[in-house]
Each structure stands twice: as C-alpha cells, then as structure tokens.
Amino acid sequence: MDKSFILNKTSSRSLARRGQLFTAHGKVETPVFCPVGSQAAVKTLTPEDLKSVNINMILSNTYHLYLRPGIPIIKEMGGLHKFMNWDEVILTDSGGYQIFSLANLRKLDEGGVSFRSHIDGSTRYITPEDAVSFQQDLGSDIAMVLDECPHSEASENEVLAAMERTHQWAKRCLAAHTLKIQHLFAIVQGGLSPELRRQSAEYLASLDFPGYALGGLSLGEPKDITFETVRHTLRFLPENKPRYLMGVGAPEDLLEGVSCGVDIFDCVLPTRVARNGAFFSRLGRLNIRNAAFATQKGPIDPECNCYTCRNYSAAYLHHLFRCEEILAYRLATIHNIAFLSNLMQEIRTSIEKDCFEEFKADFLSRYQPTNEAIRIEQKQKWLFGRNGEPPS
C-alpha cells in the first residue's frame, strides 16, 4: 500500500512523533498501544468493550492460532476479522518469539524451525514462507516476519547467528509476501549489542519494508538498557516508516518509548496484571486486594471515567477479587485498557501541542513505578508461560 504512514509532527525537544498509519481496516493514530488478543480474544473483553474505550487496533498471535483452532478453519470462516467479529485493525505476530521460548522443545536450521506443540506434543515445522502464508490466510492488516529471538543469556556469537538468520528469513518472507493490502514488518534483532543493532537496522532498512519492529527487548534486562538500545537502534531506521517496540506496555515505559521515537506498542501487561488485581492509576498500580479498599465508597481511580469507575466502588471490586468472581477480572481489564487508551490520547495531544516533555514530566512526578527488582522477577516468570505453555 502506498503512503501507508504519514508523519504529522515531531516534538521540538525530543524524538516523540505524531503520525497516522493507514490499513485495509482503517486509520490508526500514532503513537498507539495495542492490547493483546493472542488467541483471537483480548482476555475477558468483547470487541464492543474495546471500541468503547477507543481501541481500534489489537494484536493476535499466529503461533497460538496455528495450533488452535488452525489456520484453515479461520480462513474458512472468512478470515480473522470475521472469525472474532472485529472490524478494526489487527496486527499478527509471526509466533517466532513463542516458538523460540520453547527452548528444549524446538530445533532450528537455515530452512526454518521445528518444535513440539505444547498442546498435544506433535512435531511441527514452520518456514519463513509458512509464517507469511499463515498470516495472509488470517487476513491481518499488519503481519510480521519470522525471526529468531535469542535468549537473554545468549553469547555474542549466538546473538550474531540469530541476527544473520533473522536477516535471511526476512528476505524470504518479503519474497513470499503477495497480499498487497497487508503491511509486512521486519524485526530488528542484535541483542543488547549497539553494533549488531546498527547492522540489523541498516540491513533491514535496505530491504524497504513498510514498517520495522524492535524485537528481543524487554526480556528482563534493566529498563535503562532497554531504552538505551531502543534510542540507538531507531537512529538507523527510516523516519518515514512506523517503528514498533514489541512487548512494552507499562505507563512509564510507553512514555519513555514515545520519547525515543516509537510509534506502536503492544503488551499483555495491562490485561495480565488486571487479572491479578492490579489497577493502573495516575499514582501507580493499586492492589485492589489491599484492606484499605474494603470500605472505599468511591471508585478505585477517581480520575478515571471508564465503565468500571463510573459504576462500581472500590469496595465492590475488592469484594469480587476476594471471592474470585469472574466479573472481577473483566472490570479490572476494562479499566486498565481504558487507562492506557486515555494515556496514549493525551500523549498524542501533547505532541500536537509540542508540550510532550512537560506532560511526561508531570505524569512521572506523580506516578510510582513498580519496584524494579520485583518487575524483573515477574518478567522472568512470565517469559516462559505456565505449565510449559509459551507466553502470549
């Protein structure tokens, strides 16, 4: 698609960008956060719920959909949009990260990767061409190349080999891609090495993809290293193409990513922590299970106008979580997605008015981030899913 991304404004004092991404299912205002619906559903929410909080772009995962219900079934149902009754924008991940998180359950060669299904133990083999074909059959608006994501403790030689294989697979994905109304994004790898990140970004930029993602980050490394790598890598990517930082979704990280020049984010964080009783607020995450909320008559977040905060007291939400009522997870998820949607709208407005830096400083002056040691510990647990299942 021609002119699929328009850059409207750049901050005068940072690299923050305001743009518009055009797809077959509509326009996306950037910077944007995408909720994750790995298995064709954002957990606990309906499409109407998402639209009610101004979400018009979500992510689904090809790995999970390939295994269950299967790409042919979704294609027979008219594609992923019709299958899940979502008429807005869908980005599909190739599933590379999920496959490589299987560790001892997978083997790879130059042709592709073989792995054992975490569902039934069957052996599967996927090539870069398969990954493209699957996503074309799904009919997503944005598809991702198959890449190799090296593990966080990989040696420099292993990171180099993964980067070079990612480059070769990217070329093959580009050659196999024929669905003109679908954008195919490349994925920059290179670990935490500034030199390898430069090489990867420059090589993939030379192939002229419609957009570029930064993979292999936010895998448990300190945040300052994450964003130092992001800032460095983006210097070597074209300014007229969208930049996508995979797996980042904490409010403070969205602000930092935007200041680096990132346009698109996705993460399971808001939905996952919601199901654990954590509500985003301007002051930081609030644990609804705390006894202090047992008698609070007002909403959990007085500054929020979402469905949950308009209709339910913190005391009621506390009760639902203590009783493990399913409604608790739904109401918490609505709130967290609404919070991030509103935050991104405020970020976009601040860039338009060229006051993003003031907005960021004001937000962070009140917001209390999660303890870094606890965050890294949680991240390491989440990276490998549960019961042998790869992460979402």
Curated annotation (Swiss-Prot):
It comes from the Bacteria. Catalyzes the base-exchange of a guanine (G) residue with the queuine precursor 7-aminomethyl-7-deazaguanine (PreQ1) at position 34 (anticodon wobble position) in tRNAs with GU(N) anticodons (tRNA-Asp, -Asn, -His and -Tyr). Catalysis occurs through a double-displacement mechanism. The nucleophile active site attacks the C1' of nucleotide 34 to detach the guanine base from the RNA, forming a covalent enzyme-RNA intermediate. The proton acceptor active site deprotonates the incoming PreQ1, allowing a nucleophilic attack on the C1' of the ribose to form the product. Residues 247-253, 271-275 are annotated as: RNA binding. Pathway: tRNA modification; tRNA-queuosine biosynthesis. This is Queuine tRNA-ribosyltransferase. The gene is tgt. InterPro entries: ArchSynthase1/Queuine_TRR, TGT, TGT-like_sf, tRNA_ribo_trans-like. Keywords: Glycosyltransferase, Metal-binding, Queuosine biosynthesis, Transferase, tRNA processing, Zinc. Its EC number is 2.4.2.29. The keyword tRNA processing applies. It is an enzyme of class 2 (transferase). It comes from Dehalococcoides mccartyi (strain CBDB1).
